[in-house]
């Protein structure tokens, strides 16, 4: 499942990137096993649900970097990793960080991998503070 999860993350990143660019997309994870589909849809939905909170967390824990200066791919990798840590408590945070770093190295550059690693490691080190931010999070996009 771990290789499939890596492929799921890549596909989720592709859809998040396209959505960020304002493209019309049809989210489809049918290429994956039933377990992979569940993982991919939950990760995609979580990244959208937690987007504003993730941006707040990224801003808080990315030293000397304004959110606007972070590239679109890197931002989506960070959002996805934060959503994964919130959504899948059974996946060790270190695995999530490593997967995010590998995505950054593959789709951006080795330097982007180090950048992503630094921010996510800072987030993991301050996880209690991050959980408090999550507790105060109100999803303004929900239609309740």
Swiss-Prot record:
One of its GO terms (molecular function) is RNA binding. GO terms for cellular component: cytosol. Gene3D superfamilies: NusB-like. It comes from the Bacteria. Pfam families: NusB. Keywords: RNA-binding, Transcription, Transcription antitermination, Transcription regulation. InterPro entries: NusB-like_sf, NusB_fam, NusB_RsmB_TIM44. GO terms for biological process: DNA-templated transcription termination; transcription antitermination. Involved in transcription antitermination. Required for transcription of ribosomal RNA (rRNA) genes. Binds specifically to the boxA antiterminator sequence of the ribosomal RNA (rrn) operons. Belongs to the NusB family. PANTHER family: ANTITERMINATION NUSB DOMAIN-CONTAINING PROTEIN, N UTILIZATION SUBSTANCE PROTEIN B-RELATED. HAMAP family: NusB. This is Transcription antitermination protein NusB. It comes from Dictyoglomus turgidum (strain DSM 6724 / Z-1310). The gene is nusB.
